[in-house]
């Protein structure tokens, strides 16, 4: 029946083609056919690349525009000024001290070196030991530092690359992984490795799933789907490993992953779905149960990025705060990344990547069987790894104990809720979403929030400016009363709201440093005083360095913004050429 329906159309098509080619010689027909097929394949590949045709078109247009001499000179002139600004900042922070650019002929003494280190560590404008910094340093205690110094002294030259020589360090790493897996309700088959930080943990997870999908499902063009609020380490993994990263929007009121958007983005090449607990920009938690359900429905692994708040969320229930399920207790969650060097309070350079089953971890490993030097295998990016850092991480966890972590979590979350509540009471401010753990994203509808960040910097505070809010709509507290704590009335109706200001944000990442010595009260008081001053002229625009940061978000040619960033990174390695 079906074939008879298409038969007349096919006959017409056949007659048409035969008529067009009736006067062609066989070699011409073969040439036309081959050329048409090759052109079709090329056109398909050109249109359906990892990067959209529109995005590539914009980049090409901007790249060609930058080749116009007048435009190129103007852009290069401005970039040179920015580069010079970054270098001057580094020079100023160095406080006029000379650089060591060649190895000294005679080595310096122990005393000289220690004094130099003390001098170097005094550079900088922010008193992080007194809690003036958002994130960065999550715990500081002289007794713990003494313990870690002793431990690192003992293990400083150890390397788990040589398990026969340093089996004790390998045992410590295995114990860190198992302790962490148990905290995240991993079963007997759960496993993992330590890494040097959250970025490497995420890189390893992406590499593992890429190789797993290639081996088990034959996927050659892998894609990972994640909310736009996910950490840029996933984008780095995409660049490193040739994985297409598909960003999906978040709910513009609660700032959680839009599950329907993630569902629509799934394709036959999807190898991983990602959720955060919490995300960095807003401090809100994605609905891991819903993401995991999506993963089960389509047989796609699910990664939970708990790098930022992992060592808070696992203790929050015991600290008296209920959270939705987010770990291996949720069916469908196949991996979790968590930083021990953040709220695990270990020294910098340690994180953990966990898997629900060894089959995923096996694809994280790199194995070379035909090297003349022998069979080579390494669990993470690095071959040699610092055994001293592994030992220090192990010592931190064993020293704190469960009770210590629960107590620290309770203090941090209590402080976060206090700051959140008090900031909502300030005329002209609002909070994005509902902070799940320790991150508070602050905005204003009546003045540019970067002005507050700049003002607080003059008082010694260091906050994080953020960019690109989700969606075109701005938070409306009256339509989302659940975002406002009980008894707190938003005061935004008392002032003129200026469209666009609510799209800018800064955030405070509360650490253990903010729970002591009245730090939270000092922060709130400084915010109240500076907002009162700003409200005298709320329409004034931001200036200084933050103005440049804000301006960069409006530049359509993102390659120029990339140049800004590269110059900033270059400045970190500045040394004088005339010394």
Residue ranges and their predicted role:
Residues 24-27, 168-169, 192-199, 226-228:
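Active-site nucleophile and cofactor-binding loops and adjacent substrate-binding regions
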